[in-house]
Curated annotation (Swiss-Prot):
Belongs to the UPF0102 family. It comes from the Bacteria. GO terms for molecular function: nucleic acid binding. It comes from Shewanella sp. (strain ANA-3). This is UPF0102 protein Shewana3_3881. Disulfide bonds: none annotated. HAMAP family: UPF0102.
């Protein structure tokens, strides 16, 4: 299992402990990928997982570029259309740095 896969597993477990329900993982489209799809009450939650072993380059949260955000939004829109879902959604980020988990709800 790669470091990225380990981080996604850790993030998934953490979010499940916080009351979210797992739906899908590593949803890939030619134009973007969604790390985790979760549900929280009536919301569908699209989660980007960022892992950094050290904070020397700005940390995991700063590693998310505007271009990445655009690709995630496009992938989420396609996911909702493909599954014929007309539901509220949000975009969260789980940042894992030095074994600490930071969950940013409605991050973008």
């Amino acid at each position: 299992m790669t470091l990225g896969q380990q981080a996604e597993s850790l993030a998934q477990g953490y979010l499940e402990q916080q009351g979210l329900t797992f739906v899908a993982r590593n949803v890939r489209y030619p134009f973007g990928e969604i790390d985790l799809v979760m549900r929280h009450k009536h919301h569908w939650v699209f989660v980007e997982v960022k892992y950094r072993s050290a904070n020397q380059f700005g940390g995991a949260i700063q590693a998310l570029s505007k271009a990445q955000i655009g690709r995630i939004r496009m992938a989420a829109s396609h996911y909702l259309q493909t599954h014929k879902l007309d539901v509220p959604c949000r975009f969260d980020v789980v940042a894992i740095e030095d074994a600490q988990i930071h969950w940013l709800v409605d991050a973008f």
